[in-house]
Each structure stands twice: as structure tokens, then as C-alpha cells.
């Protein structure tokens, strides 16, 4: 069960949602965001949840520690968490002990080294009827994780990666086609750190996208300076 737009919910709504969903089979509550999840309502809900369900793990995740500062976490996963989550739930995970400034202790799991999930070839998300996806919505899609550049201002963990770290083109094609057939989705936000970090990636995915029975609208972060010198990339993006 994934709850989006949580910052728009009231504390009472989050509590009611929890009462409806949490049962004896619930293993954990996950809190995660691309950027900060440090807002008052979520703090209040997380502490309420831990008081109500002390035996259920609260697992947080982000690329940066400070994004989860102060939350009552049992585990904090640093990096992409798919493989690390399996290790946590199996009870066989490597971790180090840490403490927030407010005194709360938690276990940090380093998914940037011990449980690397940056080179997964299947990055698809499968939505369900209860997600209520509307045709005009903008969904997120991943081409790959990490970046080949090593910019000095960047704090991204997976940078300066020189090999092909992107997903398979068939996997991307199948995800986009599934979303179109089920929900009528044509609009996407590409979550890659740099969409046009290397030409081969753009060419592969452009080939897959051109096979689709529709033309998707996609937006993502690109380096414009690279396009000036790479006419082939312009053609692939268009």
C-alpha cells in the first residue's frame, strides 16, 4: 500500500487511514521521499504510529540523512532500497548504529555499497485499479540510476559511473505500453539524474519509444551544453 501526496493529508486522515489498513500481517511502515519529508504532520503521525504499534518497524529512506532527521525510525536506508528492504525483513541485514540530535537511536543500512540496487534492469512500476490513475496524470519513469559525470557541486552517491547502468529497453517499452493500455497514460517525468548523460542510452530508449502506438510526452533534467555538440542526441530526443 503506497500513499502519495502525504503532505496534503491531515493528521486525523493519516490516523484513520492507518486504522483501516494496519493489521496483524503488517510488517513495516515506510517513509520515503526524493527530497525532504520533514514536515510537522508526518512527524506527529510517525510518533503516534510508533506508540500505537511499537512492534511494527518504521523504515525511512532517502539519499541524504538530513531528509529524515528526527523521525522515529528503526532503520534508515541510504540509497536505492529494493535489495536492502529484503535483507531487513529477512532479519539478516548489515547496519551501523546512529542517533538523531533529539536522542532517538536507529540503524543505518548502507544501500550504496552493501545492497546496491543502482544497476537493476527491471525498473518498472505496476499500478492497480485502486491507484485511480487518470489519463492526464504525469507518472514517473526511470531510464537508469546514477550518472556518468562527477560534477564537484553534486552530492549524488551514484556518480562517475562509466559503464551502462540503465534498464533494458524492452522493460521500458513494456511499462509504457501497459500504462497506456490500462490508464491512457502518455505523460511522464523522467527521474534520471541526467537524462542525456550518454548517447547510447538515448538511442536505445528512443528506439523502444518509437515502437509504441502513441507518442509520449516526457520531461526530465538534461545538460543542454551536451546537445550543442551532439546533433544525434537532438534527433533521438525529438
What are these regions (language model features)?
Residues 1-176, 180-184:
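Acidic, low-complexity intrinsically disordered segments
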Residues 169, 173-238:
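Conserved SAM/AdoMet-binding glycine-rich loop
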Amino acid at each position: 500500500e503506497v500513499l502519495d501526496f502525504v503532505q496534503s493529508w491531515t493528521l486525523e486522515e493519516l490516523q484513520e487511514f492507518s486504522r483501516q489498513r494496519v493489521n496483524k500481517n503488517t510488517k513495516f511502515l515506510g517513509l520515503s521521499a526524493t527530497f525532504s519529508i520533514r514536515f510537522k504532520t508526518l512527524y506527529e503521525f510517525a510518533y503516534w504510529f510508533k506508540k500505537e504499534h511499537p512492534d511494527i518497524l518504521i523504515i525511512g529512506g532517502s539519499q541524504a540523512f538530513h531528509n529524515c532527521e528526527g523521525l522515529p525510525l528503526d532503520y534508515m536506508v541510504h540509497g536505492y532500497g529494493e535489495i536492502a528492504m529484503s535483507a531487513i525483513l529477512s532479519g539478516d541485514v548489515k547496519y551501523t548504529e546512529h542517533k538523531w540530535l533529539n536522542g532517538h537511536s536507529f540503524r543505518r543500512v548502507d544501500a550504496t555499497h552493501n545492497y546496491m540496487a543502482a544497476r537493476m534492469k527491471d525498473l518498472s512500476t505496476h499500478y492497480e485499479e485502486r491507484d485511480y490513475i487518470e489519463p492526464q496524470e504525469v507518472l514517473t519513469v526511470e531510464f537508469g540510476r546514477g550518472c556518468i559525470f562527477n560534477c564537484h557541486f553534486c552530492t549524488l552517491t551514484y556518480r562517475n559511473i562509466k559503464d551502462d547502468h540503465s534498464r533494458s529497453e524492452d522493460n521500458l517499452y513494456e511499462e509504457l505500453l501497459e500504462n497506456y493500455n490500462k490508464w491512457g497514460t502518455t505523460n511522464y517525468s523522467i527521474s534520471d539524474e541526467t537524462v542525456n548523460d550518454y548517447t547510447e542510452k538515448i538511442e536505445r530508449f528512443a528506439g523502444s519509444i518509437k515502437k509504441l502506438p502513441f507518442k509520449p510526452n516526457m520531461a526530465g533534467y538534461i545538460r543542454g551544453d551536451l546537445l550543442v555538440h551532439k546533433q544525434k542526441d537532438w534527433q533521438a530526443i525529438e
